[in-house]
Amino acid sequence: MNCACRVIAVCLLLVQVSGFLFNFNQDPPTPPQPYEDKFLNSGCEGYLCPDTLECVSHVKECPCPFPKSQLKCTLPNNQYICISKPATHDEKLNAIYDDPAKGPKAKNKGIRDCGWVLEAYKDQV
């Protein structure tokens, strides 16, 4: 095999190898189903929560998107808002905020919890 054939063979091999190495897994990802399609095609007979797309009976039953790290504070108009659980090193307070019944009712001075949210809602902050 002469020198020119070897050069051509090496070049062809390099083209194939580079095509494999640099184009590997380059197929475009399939786009996620748009939010609007999920919302409109949910088949929910009750209320469809906008944040989580959970189907519930009433708006006040909607869960927070991240329940392990959020408190669901119910407002006087029966709407709700999800806030981050207060960061504290007090184990008793952490236990209260982790309790799904006690956490949303907690009102501790100096801590931005659901009690603080209600005061802010009533323009008392």
UniProtKB/Swiss-Prot annotation:
> Which superkingdom?
Eukaryota
**UniProt key word Signal:** yes
The identity of this protein, by name, is Long chronological lifespan protein 2
**Summary of the function given for this chain in its UniProt record:** Probable component of the endoplasmic reticulum-associated degradation (ERAD) pathway.
According to its UniProt record, which protein family does this protein belong to?
Belongs to the LCL2 family.
The yes or no answer to whether the keyword Zinc-finger is present is no
Its keywords, alphabetically, are: Signal
Q: What's a BP term from Gene Ontology annotated to this protein?
A: ERAD pathway
Q: What phylogenetic lineage does the species belong to?
A: Eukaryota, Fungi, Dikarya, Ascomycota, Saccharomycotina
Tell me the leader sequence span: 1-19
CDD domains in the cross-refs: LCL2-like (cd23996)
